[in-house]
Amino acid sequence: MHGSSKSIFGKIRDSRYATRYIVGDGIDIGAGPDSIAQYYELFPLMKSCRSWDMPDGDAELMGSIKDNTFDFVHSSHCLEHMRNPSIAFDNWLRILKPGGYMICLIPDEDLYEQGEFPSTFNPDHKHTFTIHKRKSWSQNSINLFDLLSNANYSIEIKKIELLDATFRYDFNRYIQKSRFDQTLTPVGECAIEFVIKKLLT
């Protein structure tokens, strides 16, 4: 999937990532082989970025990490694997310093799952996500607006964006298939990205 790498082009075009969001000491939760840290030259104010994956512990609890540890928290396509994304989200905020930023990417349920759940493209997905809907076809759907508004910390929303610039809406018809995982292609994105700031109170 390489969601972090695919999102780099958008981050380059927005100076806030290099000057505000990805600054200081951070952690990339669920980084796998595609950590944001590999693009260190694009984020010159980033001092360090720890990669966190399954061998490091439960990403939902982040139990070994103290409160208010990191200047930024980055995560690409990890929240959908959590048993309880609300608990995970609050713990990710817990380890973020006040004034720090969380940059998170999650799959959009319509573009990625394409109307079927449990996921046929990634069976470990436990939830689907949408920016906001009155009603979803997925019984496990989470509205991002609801997740953010129910956080146990004070936050400021800096950005919410559907990353669909390289998603080809007519591709299934073109290749004559009913469904296809476009993240298998080198450029295909079908994600939601949100950036939030943890406030002091």
Predicted regions and their residues:
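Glycine/Thr-rich phosphate-binding loops of Rossmann-like dinucleotide-binding domains
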Residues: 37, 83, 112
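Conserved N-terminal segment of class I S-adenosyl-L-methionine
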Residues: 1-68, 72, 161-175, 186-201
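Generic anion/oxyanion-binding catalytic loop in active/binding sites
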Residues: 59-62, 77, 133
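Glycine-rich, phosphate-binding/catalytic loops in enzymes
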Residues: 43-46, 66-68, 90-95, 120-123
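Residue-level recognition of oxygen-bearing side chains
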Residues: 70, 84-87
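S-adenosyl-L-methionine-dependent methyltransferase catalytic module, highlighting the catalytic core
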Residues: 21, 86-93, 101-201
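A short beta-strand submotif of the Rossmann-like class I SAM-dependent methyltransferase core
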Residues: 72-78
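Helix-to-beta-strand junctions that scaffold the AdoMet/dcAdoMet cofactor pocket
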Residues: 82-83, 96-97
